């Protein structure tokens, strides 16, 4: 159960699925290293999100989407 009503698979800023993270990065034409640097996280953290070993926090996902859109 999510600890907050806006988190989880159905909230407005839901945690993205690993495949969604990878697809967004590839669509932006970024390497994992560049994507991690773009949102100020570690390369290992980004790799964990894409592998499905950790869930990406909605704030990181939103920041990534904003930065690649501009």
Write out the residue ranges for each language-model feature.
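DNA major-groove recognition helix of helix-turn-helix/homeodomain DNA-binding modules
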Residues: 40, 54-70
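Alpha-helix N-cap/N′ positions at the starts of helices
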Residues: 16-17, 41
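N-terminal flexible/basic segments that precede or flank functional cores
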Residues: 1-15, 63-66
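Short alpha-helical DNA-recognition segment
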Residues: 29-47
